[in-house]
């Protein structure tokens, strides 16, 4: 698979991960403002948000690595 194809695929995954992370954060913040939310529910929501955010960051890091490879290939 060429570099451009890999980058397009990762960009698509990044957008999906970003959307999921934003939704998970919104869910967590909504629960945090809900007086009837249980501590367990808050913790689960926070962990889900953090997991998705970490995935987003990992994808961004991989995109950076591939872009560096592309620059090295050009030079």
Predicted segments, located by residue:
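A generic signature of intrinsically disordered, low-complexity regions enriched in glycine/proline
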Residues: 6, 15, 38, 44, ...
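Residue-level detector of functional hotspots within protein domains
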Residues: 7, 28, 55
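Short intrinsically disordered terminal tails
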Residues: 1-3, 68-75
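Short E/K-rich amphipathic alpha-helical oligomerization segments
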Residues: 15-47
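Amphipathic alpha-helical coiled-coil segments
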Residues: 21-23, 47-71
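Short, charge/polar-rich alpha-helical segments
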Residues: 1-19
């Amino acid at each position: 698979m060429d570099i451009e194809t890999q980058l397009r695929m990762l960009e698509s995954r990044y957008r999906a991960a970003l959307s999921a992370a934003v939704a998970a954060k919104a869910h967590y913040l909504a629960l945090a403002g809900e007086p009837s939310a249980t501590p367990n529910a808050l913790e689960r929501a926070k962990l889900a948000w953090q997991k998705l955010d970490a995935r987003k960051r990992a994808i961004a890091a991989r995109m950076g690595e591939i872009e560096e490879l592309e620059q090295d290939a050009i030079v």
